């Protein structure tokens, strides 16, 4: 499996139950580094070839640019930016910032980073779930999400979006906590 023998990756395994997934999310809430959650329902990933990155209107979404660019550069994976289908321009602006980052890193390092922008069918509130639902269509090996900043009433009653994605996903899910002091990936 791709994650074995890698000291840089925080890997959490749990069963697919809501309680088990929520326990992992609560346990990892303060981490400054990205972490990967794997359940028994997920297929084994031997190589990263395609990474789905759902992009919503939230300003924290751009934190994922550095992570997906790093992974793509190191593994040669193709990045799929799944842009939320919103009426406003915020998701489009976030995708633009992510593309700018991808191009800048590609130019600076002299590597070719492959990416594409796909318009989601759902809006910002449901784009993460759409990524989980369409992972087979995209032949994805990883879903990259930003964790919830604060849990609102809906999250407390029904569970945060990332929990639902992890429960539905058939591939590992990498989460990034939205923190100003987010750990920076370096070579």
Task: Name each region found by the language model.
Residues 53-55, 97-100, 162-163:
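Short, hinge-like loop/turn segments at secondary-structure boundaries
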Residues 59-62, 96, 121-125, 156:
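Conserved phosphate-coordination/catalytic loops
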Residues 53-54, 86-88, 116-117, 147-148:
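A short, structure-level motif marking secondary-structure boundaries and short turns
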Residues 61-111:
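Redox- and metal-dependent alpha/beta enzyme cores, enriched for Fe-S-associated oxidoreductases
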Residues 3, 8-69, 73-74, 80-82, ...:
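Intrinsically disordered or low-complexity boundary/linker segments at protein termini
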Residues 1-26, 30, 109-143, 148-153, ...:
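Structural beta-alpha unit
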Residues 31-34, 93-98, 125-129:
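Short acidic/polar alpha-helix capping motifs at helix-coil junctions
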Residues 15-16, 59, 85-90, 120-122:
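Short histidine/acidic/glycine/proline-rich micro-motifs that form metal-
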């Amino acid at each position: 499996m791709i994650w074995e023998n890698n000291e840089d990756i925080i890997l959490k395994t749990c069963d697919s139950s809501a309680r088990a997934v929520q326990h992992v999310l609560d346990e990892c809430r303060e981490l400054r580094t990205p972490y990967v959650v794997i359940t028994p329902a997920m297929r084994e990933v031997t190589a990263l070839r395609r990474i789905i990155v759902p992009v919503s209107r939230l300003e924290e979404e751009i934190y994922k640019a550095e992570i997906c660019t790093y992974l793509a550069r190191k593994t040669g994976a193709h990045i799929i930016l799944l842009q939320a289908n919103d009426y406003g321009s915020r998701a489009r602006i976030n995708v633009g910032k992510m593309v700018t980052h991808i191009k800048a890193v590609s130019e600076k390092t002299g590597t070719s980073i492959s990416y594409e922008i796909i318009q989601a069918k759902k809006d910002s509130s449901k784009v993460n779930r759409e990524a989980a639902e369409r992972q087979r269509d995209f032949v994805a090996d990883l879903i990259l999400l930003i964790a919830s900043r604060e849990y609102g009433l809906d999250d407390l009653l029904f569970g945060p979006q990332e929990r639902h994605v992890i429960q539905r996903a058939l591939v590992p899910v990498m989460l990034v906590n939205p923190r100003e002091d987010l750990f920076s990936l370096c070579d």
